[in-house]
């Protein structure tokens, strides 16, 4: 007896339809019936079927590969639903692999045609809010510092209150019991504006994972996601063809970030700042450099973290009176490798914003203050892009990352006309808003503009959610305001403290090798400078200090004379200052090659072995003054005369 016909339901991104079929029919026989319900330009060979929405992990099979298989043999029954995936012929011609329309058929919500293009190029690219890691506490590898801070209880110990405590010396009461690291009264008393990252983590964890509930552990951190989900399970066409409440981002309510991933920036020596300022002193143009250092525990705040800067590398750039234009940094990976061999990593960026006051006393104009701005909208966007490139790995986040430890420092004039350092970070919300192309810099530095979907100048496909922030209105009441078209940049900014160590002991004790990429002011790195640095005149202590220069190490790396093991040894000599390592270094083939290069270039190489195992290095000289003069004391040097001639030249 023939089987009774059944009705199968099909759902694709263009809608749903039904087909009446026989259980004995083969799958390929459905192709023509299915094509009747699909767009005319559908490629027949691209049709695939799945038991779940396409792209959500179902069992997807191409219809052509099911030849010889009957519908009844796979268990399909009356009323079952199958999900369709397919591609248009034009999409295949354009090289699309996901079937999304990439030509003018892609439209905004207002109907304006746009191509399907990536809006912002930032690495690494998060995929979606659902791209979580299973058991991140077992998989994600944190930094050793984060692991060490995780093991600390972070409690703030208090002494016995002689007035309020009635118990003995071994007792404890509410007046002397340890406080949590996020205690608001303690933070207000110590004038700590932002929680440290691990204090904030303890605060969230106390509310998310309560031990008394004995529930399964949930990571307390979750990165914001302000973009349209590309893996929406609703079955509608992908954005910008379609959108629903499941895939569109919610409205954004901006508020000052209560925590910071780095609490303090410490410069190991004032000479680091002075060397960067020297470029401005000689040219009058601004300068930018990347900070290399380490992250360490900062004991001034509970569970705090500080970035200790040991070196500043100045990448290729065009410097102007009012800003800097960065060129492509071809040897960035090589510089990062040299830093890694010295135990360092890229921790931030620093740039100058200085203008001589013209008083003749070295004072500069104060442009950044409470009535103007501290970090402009363009600079916040720049900081957010850099922070997006260097995410912070953490096992307390469902995606395995949260925020960034990358810092941004500015050298500018203070209210007294002196040159001072300021340290900042862009908030986590700011990084995601820049990544989602929701905001853009304004000509007014104190405000950030919200993008508009109707703006077709960039010809990009983006969804702009509603953005709100709270402010004190003219009646003294905190009221919610619509952030369009612009809002204050303070909502995207986190301030950090900065300073210098009480007893300076920099990792690199020499700093007179010419700094890279300064040819515009007549300074260049040449072999004669290497020969001059390495002449010890029999002084082993001086010879050890000679290679303890980050800029010299980067230049030697560019010569490719040392093997990887020899470069690692060179890094140890530069940072540890061990005479035994120095003796081993001058016995390597790479060192002999360097001597040969200096001889063939006509420069004078070291005349004798400059290290002895019996000798020990002298004490490292103390750090210089922490006062940054606006101009050098002696204007009679050759560099000063060159600077005077250069100052009138164009920097473009």
UniProtKB/Swiss-Prot annotation:
<dbReference type="GO" id="GO:0048471">
    <property type="term" value="C:perinuclear region of cytoplasm"/>
</dbReference>
<feature type="compositionally biased region" description="Polar residues">
    <location>
        <begin position="116"/>
        <end position="130"/>
    </location>
</feature>
<keyword id="KW-0813">Transport</keyword>
<feature type="region of interest" description="Disordered">
    <location>
        <begin position="94"/>
        <end position="132"/>
    </location>
</feature>
<dbReference type="Pfam" id="PF05021">
    <property type="entry name" value="NPL4"/>
</dbReference>
<feature type="domain" description="MPN">
    <location>
        <begin position="265"/>
        <end position="402"/>
    </location>
</feature>
<dbReference type="InterPro" id="IPR029071">
    <property type="entry name" value="Ubiquitin-like_domsf"/>
</dbReference>
<dbReference type="InterPro" id="IPR007717">
    <property type="entry name" value="NPL4_C"/>
</dbReference>
<feature type="region of interest" description="Disordered">
    <location>
        <begin position="602"/>
        <end position="652"/>
    </location>
</feature>
<dbReference type="GO" id="GO:0015031">
    <property type="term" value="P:protein transport"/>
</dbReference>
<protein>
    <recommendedName>
        <fullName>Nuclear protein localization protein 4</fullName>
    </recommendedName>
</protein>
<keyword id="KW-0539">Nucleus</keyword>
<dbReference type="Pfam" id="PF05020">
    <property type="entry name" value="zf-NPL4"/>
</dbReference>
<keyword id="KW-0472">Membrane</keyword>
<keyword id="KW-0811">Translocation</keyword>
<keyword id="KW-0256">Endoplasmic reticulum</keyword>
<dbReference type="InterPro" id="IPR037518">
    <property type="entry name" value="MPN"/>
</dbReference>
<keyword id="KW-0653">Protein transport</keyword>
<dbReference type="InterPro" id="IPR016563">
    <property type="entry name" value="Npl4"/>
</dbReference>
<dbReference type="InterPro" id="IPR007716">
    <property type="entry name" value="NPL4_Zn-bd_put"/>
</dbReference>
<dbReference type="GO" id="GO:0031965">
    <property type="term" value="C:nuclear membrane"/>
</dbReference>
<keyword id="KW-0509">mRNA transport</keyword>
<comment type="function">
    <text>Involved in the import of nuclear-targeted proteins into the nucleus and the export of poly(A) RNA out of the nucleus. Has a role in the endoplasmic reticulum-associated degradation (ERAD) pathway.</text>
</comment>
<dbReference type="GO" id="GO:0051028">
    <property type="term" value="P:mRNA transport"/>
</dbReference>
<comment type="similarity">
    <text>Belongs to the NPL4 family.</text>
</comment>
<feature type="compositionally biased region" description="Basic and acidic residues">
    <location>
        <begin position="633"/>
        <end position="643"/>
    </location>
</feature>
<keyword id="KW-0963">Cytoplasm</keyword>
<feature type="compositionally biased region" description="Polar residues">
    <location>
        <begin position="94"/>
        <end position="108"/>
    </location>
</feature>
<dbReference type="GO" id="GO:0043130">
    <property type="term" value="F:ubiquitin binding"/>
</dbReference>
<dbReference type="GO" id="GO:0031625">
    <property type="term" value="F:ubiquitin protein ligase binding"/>
</dbReference>
<dbReference type="GO" id="GO:0006511">
    <property type="term" value="P:ubiquitin-dependent protein catabolic process"/>
</dbReference>
<dbReference type="GO" id="GO:0005789">
    <property type="term" value="C:endoplasmic reticulum membrane"/>
</dbReference>
